[in-house]
Amino acid sequence: MNNSMISPSVVDLLEKIHDRYSLVILTSKRARQIIEGAEPQISIKSNKPLTIAINEVDQDAVEFEILEEGLK
């Protein structure tokens, strides 16, 4: 794991999602789902939707599919 102040680090997340654009789209869409009432897929102390979404991606709790025309 990287010794950064942010956990998980962007470098760690980019090992799962191979480009920054897709990472931003995935986490923002998931955060929006949480804001709209979706239950978090992980147990986490934070109540911030984006923090929850980022940690869900890090813990492989979010399923996604990358299509030629973009993220689904």
Swiss-Prot record:
InterPro entries: DNA-dir_RNA_pol_omega, Pol_omega/Rpo6/RPB6, RPB6/omega-like_sf. One of its GO terms (molecular function) is DNA-directed RNA polymerase activity. Keywords: DNA-directed RNA polymerase, Nucleotidyltransferase, Transcription, Transferase. One of its GO terms (biological process) is DNA-templated transcription. Signal peptide: none annotated. It catalyses: RNA(n) + a ribonucleoside 5'-triphosphate = RNA(n+1) + diphosphate. It holds the Pfam family RNA_pol_Rpb6. It is an enzyme of class 2 (transferase). Its EC number is 2.7.7.6. GO terms for cellular component: DNA-directed RNA polymerase complex. Belongs to the RNA polymerase subunit omega family. Promotes RNA polymerase assembly. Latches the N- and C-terminal regions of the beta' subunit thereby facilitating its interaction with the beta and alpha subunits. The RNAP catalytic core consists of 2 alpha, 1 beta, 1 beta' and 1 omega subunit. When a sigma factor is associated with the core the holoenzyme is formed, which can initiate transcription. This is DNA-directed RNA polymerase subunit omega. It comes from Clostridium beijerinckii (strain ATCC 51743 / NCIMB 8052). The gene is rpoZ.
